[in-house]
Structure formats: structure tokens, C-alpha cells
Design a protein with these regions (language model features):
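HhH-family (HhH-GPD) DNA N-glycosylase catalytic core used in base-excision repair
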Residues: 1-199
Length: 199
């Protein structure tokens, strides 16, 4: 059997083997992945993984309540942290998104209830994706992106959201010969669907 081709470093390999595509049903981990995907806009994912520990420290290990309460002094502290990504609009967006995240929790009981509701609480396997062909965005990610933006989220475009859906296991985009593809399918409630307005 062969794994997916994109993990090119040991750190990337660990992320592929133990995180990417594994269904997340915990709000804090959903928030962490969404923040990391938002930070990644325009950057490489490997850079984000390399800075992940610094990012975690800057954002109180993605404590949603803590991040939602951040003020100017917290932003300045993050901006001055050595090794941290220093693009202020993204930092401000994470703080903004924490507050929006909490509003969703209040409305739906949890963010997981909200986002998994878009897939009827199933992990999607799209036609042709197990052959190694998957898009940067699709109809599902566009719909979720639009809804999140209407709820006040920032830096959550369709491409970012598609990556989030892959990472958090709402879509299983591992190749069919990758052991992770089969492992996830054994434990997840899956549904096979035709492609959805892909780009």
C-alpha cells in the first residue's frame, strides 16, 4: 500500500498519519484547525506546522473564551512574539472569529453540531477523490464559507474552508491506497457522493 504523496517531511508525515482527515468532534480542536487554516492563507501549510507550537502559545492553546476576550495589549504581545506570524489582520480575525464561534455554540449547542450538520453528520467521500483528484474548493465549502461570513467570520473563503473540511474529517480525501483512507472509513459514518461544483 502507498500513502498520499504530499507529506514530504517527517513533520508533514506525522500530520498526515495522525491528524489530517481524522473526524474532529471536539470544539476546541475544530477552533484550532480553523484558526490554523485561516493563518495559512497565502502561506505554505508546512510553515504553519513548523510554527504551530508558537501559535498555540500566542493564542492560549486555542482556549475559545480566552481568545474571544483578547484586547489591544494581547494583539501587541502576539505581534512581538519571536517566530510568530506578524500579519495583524489575521491575528485580529482569529479574535473576531472566536467571538463568532461562541455565538454559533450558543445557537447550535456546539460548533461541531453546526459544521457537521452540513454533511448530515457523515464523512464525505467524493467520486474520483480516492484516485488522487480533489479540488481546492467545491459547492459545500462555498456554502459553508458564505454562511460563516454572514455570521461574522473573517478569512474563511471557500478554499480555506475546503482545507478545513479535509483536515477535520468532514471530507476523506486520502488516496484509496493510503492506509489512512481505510482506517478512517472503518470508524467514521461515511457517505459517498458525486462531485459538487468543484474548482
Amino acid at each position: 500500500m502507498t500513502i498520499c504523496e504530499w507529506p514530504t517531511t517527517p513533520l508533514y508525515q506525522d500530520y498526515h498519519d495522525y491528524e489530517w482527515g481524522r473526524p474532529i468532534h471536539d470544539d476546541q480542536h475544530q477552533f484550532e484547525h480553523l484558526c490554523l487554516e485561516s493563518l495559512q492563507c497565502g502561506l505554505s501549510w508546512l510553515m504553519i506546522l513548523n510554527k504551530r507550537n508558537i501559535i498555540r502559545e500566542c493564542f492560549d492553546h486555542f482556549d475559545i473564551d480566552a481568545v474571544a476576550a483578547y484586547g489591544e495589549s494581547d494583539i501587541e504581545h502576539i505581534m512581538q512574539t519571536e517566530g510568530m506570524l506578524k500579519y495583524r489582520p489575521k491575528i485580529e480575525a482569529i479574535i473576531n472569529n472566536a467571538a463568532a464561534f461562541k455565538r454559533i455554540q450558543s445557537e447550535f449547542g456546539s460548533f461541531c453540531n453546526y459544521i457537521w450538520g452540513f454533511t448530515n453528520h457523515k464523512t464525505i467521500i467524493y467520486e474520483n477523490h480516492p484516485e488522487g483528484h480533489f479540488p481546492t474548493k467545491n459547492g459545500l465549502s462555498t456554502r459553508i464559507s458564505k454562511d460563516l461570513k454572514q455570521r461574522g467570520f473573517k478569512f474563511v473563503g471557500p478554499v480555506t474552508i475546503y482545507s478545513h473540511l479535509q483536515a477535520s474529517g468532514l471530507i476523506n480525501d486520502h488516496g484509496k491506497d493510503c492506509p489512512c483512507f481505510k482506517e478512517i472509513n472503518k470508524t467514521a459514518d461515511i457517505v459517498r457522493l458525486p462531485v459538487d461544483d468543484e474548482a
